[in-house]
Structures are given as structure tokens and as C-alpha cells.
Amino acid sequence: PNDRPRPPTKGSPSDSPLFNRAVQGVYELGSTFKIFAAAQALEIGLANPSTLIDADAPMRWGKYTIKEFEGHNYGPLISLTDVIVKSSNVGTAHVALQIGEKRQQEFLKALGFFEPTKVELFEAPYAKPLTPKNWSDIHTITISYGHGLSASPLHLAAAYASLTNGGTKVTPTLVKQAYRIPGPRIVSEETSAAARA
């Protein structure tokens, strides 16, 4: 079953019915990433759910302008909870800048966004997320709201599970197990509970 022939037609491999989009496809995952910046801010003590965050749009960063979807302006200040509820790009960007480039990378790495998933599928080792070569402040900003880093839907599901299952790393598996051995701690149980709220 793993000696699959190449599709008989020309074109992109991702057009093949044999291409596993959930595992092999890497995409910019957009606003689904915002929860990671908020959770990290909670975890490292930068904010609590009611901390007021600058959400005045648009935000200028050097030659770049960060806008909200459909031109909304949620500012000048909204709570960290509302940054997630309203899906504020600007609010998330401000949170990410407080976290900083290095801590953001470490957190996303702990969640599994720098390596292929370890699921027991032939194609899994070939689906490594795409990350910036030179991670700058603008990458820190855009990655916080899901642009500039591409990962598979399975990466996202595993990261969400790790964040919301009590805060320990979840490794996807197809093997039925009598019980799950918890992975390394990613966030505290308190942060995990806040992310679920």
C-alpha cells in the first residue's frame, strides 16, 4: 500500500488524489494561530484574560501596515479575551511583539511547528512546516496571526490538542492505545483552562 505509483497525469502533486492534504499539505493557517500568542502571553505572565491590549487599527510597523479584516478597528484598547473573540490582527501583533521573536519561536517549536508530525503514515516525514529563513519583527507579527509560517492541518490539530488537553504535548497517532502517556508540558493547566474558556 505504500508503494503508490505516481499519478498518470501531469500537474501539481497536490492535485493528485493520493496527496494527503491533512498531512502533506502545508498552508498559512490564518487566524487559527492567534490563540498561540494569547496562550503564550498568559503562560509567561505578560497578560491575563482581561489585560487591555492595543488594538487601534491600522498599525504601522516600518514600511508595513497591519490591518483588520474588512477594515474594522477594535481599538483603542480591548481585553486579551476580545483579541481572540474579535480575531484582531492588530491586537495579536501587539501581543506577539511583547512576547518577542525568540520566545515565540521556542513556543511554536515546542508545539511541533518546526518538524514533521510523527504520525504513523508513509508521507508524514516529508511534510515539514515552512518557516522564515531570517525571522524578523515583521515575521513575529505576521506569524502571530497565521501568515508567514505554513504548516499542515495535522500540525494545527496536534498543537490545539496540546494547548487544550491540560497543557501537555500531544503526538498524533493512528495506533489505539489503552492509555496515553502525557508528553512534555507546554503550558500550565491554568493556561490550558483559559484557552478552553
Label the model's feature ranges.
Residues 1-31, 36-197:
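Beta-lactam-recognizing serine transpeptidase/beta-lactamase-like catalytic domain environment
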